[in-house]
Amino acid sequence: MDSNTITSFQDILQRMSKMQLESSSVDLNGMITQFERLKIYRDSLGESVMRMGDLHSLQNRNATWREELSQKFEEIRWLIAECRNILTKTENSFEQITFLQALQLLLEVESEIRTFSFQLI
């Protein structure tokens, strides 16, 4: 993974963890957890693609990888919708910047996961 992406994930997660949104903190904690899981999934998928010999073993070992991939895209779409929802409600510039950057990062990660998945197919 590119070091800028790692920094972006860490920066966004750190800033989100310090926020107190008007919505419940449970919602924000859920978003943070999903961001962390998405980062781990993206990293592992990218590593599998980089080790071309592992592609066939990944497909053989994990017959449900396409289902997992579909689930991750659903999670990304949910996170994008949540970020957009927060952006429409907040007037706090710190929150706006954080969630705009989170939205941009989600779109980049979605594109990268699509690229990785096409290489796996």
Swiss-Prot record:
HAMAP family: INFV_NEP (MF_04067). Average number present in a viral particle is estimated to be 130-200 molecules. InterPro entries: Flu_NS2 (IPR000968). Coiled coil: none annotated. One of its GO terms (cellular component) is host cell nucleus. Interacts with protein M1. May interact with host nucleoporin RAB/HRB and exportin XPO1/CRM1. A motif (Nuclear export signal) lies at residues 12-21, 85-94. This is Nuclear export protein. Keywords: Host nucleus, Host-virus interaction, Transport, Virion. It is found in: Virion; Host nucleus. It comes from the Viruses. Mediates the nuclear export of encapsidated genomic RNAs (ribonucleoproteins, RNPs). Acts as an adapter between viral RNPs complexes and the nuclear export machinery of the cell. Possesses no intrinsic RNA-binding activity, but includes a C-terminal M1-binding domain. This domain is believed to allow recognition of RNPs bound to the protein M1. One of its GO terms (biological process) is exit of virus from host cell nucleus through nuclear pore. Belongs to the influenza viruses NEP family.
